[in-house]
UniProtKB/Swiss-Prot annotation:
HAMAP family: Ribosomal_bL33. Disulfide bonds: none annotated. This is Large ribosomal subunit protein bL33B. Keywords: Ribonucleoprotein, Ribosomal protein. InterPro entries: Ribosomal_bL33, Ribosomal_bL33_CS, Ribosomal_bL33_sf, Ribosomal_zn-bd.
Length: 49
């Protein structure tokens, strides 16, 4: 079952990306290094509700 998730920047808190994930394969929260346009650099983005 795929669900929509939002990825938020850990430094500024902006929710910059929307993605989907398979909850059966990845029950934990996803953390990815993505580009934050507000800070103009790559930062860690964490899954939010």
């Amino acid at each position: 079952m795929r669900v929509n998730i939002t990825l938020a920047c850990t430094e500024c808190g902006d929710r910059n990306y929307i993605s989907t994930k398979n909850k059966r394969n990845h029950p934990e929260r996803i953390e990815l290094k993505k580009f934050c346009p507000r800070l103009n650099k790559y930062t860690l983005h964490r899954e939010t509700k």
